[in-house]
Design a protein with these regions (language model features):
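Positively charged, small/polar-rich N-terminal and surface patches that mediate targeting and assembly
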Residues: 2-118
């Protein structure tokens, strides 16, 4: 077992992983989360092979893997919204901390997650 030690201030940003049953479902969820400013971007990886336990059996499915960039403060809303939009009973929604990145990318990420000024 190990732990990550941050020197200085930790990054408040996350990479959120999700799988979806189809490209159409993944696109619908990502576009909704973008419109609601819960994510800054989403990347889709088509046709990953997933193996998992479900109802006492080992299952295999082709799924779409989605990487989304968001923030710690938006994760609960994002997770709740994915649960509302997703077709799975138990959708995969995992958050990984971003420990570092290029300054320009992190500034862009922050700007995308701020409310739109009218």
């Amino acid at each position: 077992h190990y732990s990550i030690v941050f020197v200085g201030e930790s990054m408040p940003y996350l990479i959120v992983l999700m799988t979806a049953s189809s490209r159409e479902e993944a696109v619908k969820i990502v576009r909704t989360l973008l419109e609601e400013r819960l994510i800054a971007c989403g990347n889709l990886v088509d046709s990953v092979s997933s193996f998992f336990w479900w109802k006492g059996e080992i299952e295999e499915e082709k799924e779409v893997l989605v990487f989304m960039k968001s923030s710690e403060k938006l994760f609960k809303k994002l997770s709740k919204r994915v649960g509302e939009l997703h077709s799975y009973d138990v959708p995969e929604i995992l958050a990984l901390p971003i420990v570092d990145g290029s300054q320009s990318y992190l500034e862009w990420l922050k700007s995308c997650l701020e409310p739109v000024k009218e």
